């Protein structure tokens, strides 16, 4: 016959060193079995194989069968398992001791740093669904005196007991005079006190000869947020929880109202302005506020937009919008 190649050639297997080795149970059992068989040949009482001669045919031939000694094999397995169990238990005790020492060291470090020893602390990140809250960076808003961001004053008054917006104003070299309306706006901002006990965001308002109101929220890269409406959205997301509307069922409705405000501020004719006001009236319907029964950032956006549109008088407003404006004025105080 022709010779076949070996399917599993003999080669050295490199065993990993990251884990401790275990004894080979089968090899150990074979070695014990071979040792016991050699010793059993000297004694008939401890023999592992018993020969039974039975005459099974007429020719007188004898058949020999080997009976396995299960008791001896069971004792060998128990002895092997006992040795391995003892070594595993010793290693486990060593690991537990090391963990106790590590726990004691961490306790000393925690005590030295003055960290609370509670195993679990409910933080604000746990309460808002896992969002990580970090200290807010100071923001800078560039605005033209002809397009005063009244939303800053409205939010500052509305959040008087919830959140502090610390606004400081400066004048850019491109502006010779900011005008009486901007100066009155600065005076009204200064009248609202800053409560140091409340969370705060610092806003630097720079009167500048710019086309759009823009906000820079990052001190490292110039990524502006254009438009007063989008600035309201940003402040609504970082402001008090009462005015955060992402988790509200009226989230889409509030965003839609703010979009209408954005279009209203860009209307060039009185006819288009009145058309946008009619859309706002449809969104308000019979509600007290655009966000339902409570004041929201949508109301702040609408109120500020109407102030910036002097051509839209009270005659252009529906009775529902007139009643809403009176209620909102009590909150924003403008």
Swiss-Prot record:
| GST C-terminal domain ranges (all copies) | 280-327
Keyword Protein biosynthesis listed: yes
Q: What is a biological process (GO) this protein takes part in?
A: translation
Q: What is this protein called?
A: Probable aminoacyl tRNA synthase complex-interacting multifunctional protein 2
- Output the CDD domains linked to this UniProt entry: GST_C_family
Quaternary structure per UniProt? Answer: Component of the aminoacyl-tRNA synthase complex which is comprised of a bifunctional glutamyl-prolyl-tRNA synthase, the monospecific isoleucyl, leucyl, glutaminyl, methionyl, lysyl, arginyl and aspartyl-tRNA synthases, and three auxiliary proteins.
Q: Keyword ATP-binding: yes or no?
A: no
Report one GO cellular component: aminoacyl-tRNA synthetase multienzyme complex
Cellular location of this protein? Cytoplasm, Cytosol; Nucleus
Reading the lineage from the top rank, the first entry is Eukaryota
Q: What UniProt keywords are attached to this protein's entry?
A: Cytoplasm, Nucleus, Protein biosynthesis
What does it do? Required for assembly and stability of the aminoacyl-tRNA synthase complex.
Write down the Pfam families for this protein, in alphabetical order.
Thioredoxin_16 (PF18569)
Q: Which InterPro entries match?
A: AIMP2 (IPR042360), AIMP2_thioredoxin (IPR041503), Glutathione-S-Trfase_C_sf (IPR036282)
